[in-house]
């Protein structure tokens, strides 16, 4: 998976298109990512001992990894490629050529 936790990304599809935010969680088995402030859903929680009233909680839902582009340090969005630098496999931005890792 080309996106990692902590990457700054731009959403390129969906209702939050154009939003730039940080990846909170990567889910490689289902090829999805949770992005801060994107795809907010309302989750209804049952009453419990900690929360006797119950509540409606807003949280981020996962979106497909193909709907985001990774930004480099200069804010250029592009596809991610892999190359070997000094014996290590690193990710780089194909548009700007800048190493991401």
From Swiss-Prot:
Keywords: Ribonucleoprotein, Ribosomal protein, RNA-binding, rRNA-binding. GO terms for biological process: translation. One of its GO terms (molecular function) is structural constituent of ribosome. GO terms for cellular component: ribonucleoprotein complex; ribosome. InterPro entries: KOW (IPR005824), Rib_uL2_dom2 (IPR014722), Ribosomal_uL24 (IPR003256), Ribosomal_uL24_CS (IPR005825), Ribosomal_uL24_KOW (IPR041988), Translation_prot_SH3-like_sf (IPR008991). Pfam families: KOW (PF00467), ribosomal_L24 (PF17136). One of two assembly initiator proteins, it binds directly to the 5'-end of the 23S rRNA, where it nucleates assembly of the 50S subunit. One of the proteins that surrounds the polypeptide exit tunnel on the outside of the subunit. Part of the 50S ribosomal subunit. HAMAP family: Ribosomal_uL24_B. Belongs to the universal ribosomal protein uL24 family. This is Large ribosomal subunit protein uL24. It comes from Streptococcus thermophilus (strain ATCC BAA-250 / LMG 18311). The gene is rplX.
């Amino acid at each position: 998976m080309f996106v990692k936790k902590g990457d700054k990304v731009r959403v390129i599809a969906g209702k939050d298109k154009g939003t730039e935010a940080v990846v909170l969680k990567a889910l490689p088995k289902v090829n999805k990512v949770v992005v801060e402030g994107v795809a907010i859903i309302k989750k209804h929680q049952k009453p419990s001992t900690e929360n006797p009233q119950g509540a409606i909680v807003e949280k981020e839902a996962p979106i497909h990894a193909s709907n985001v582009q990774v930004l480099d340090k200069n804010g250029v969005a592009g596809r991610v490629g892999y190359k070997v630098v000094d014996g290590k496999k690193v990710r780089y931005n194909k548009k700007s050529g800048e190493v991401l890792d």
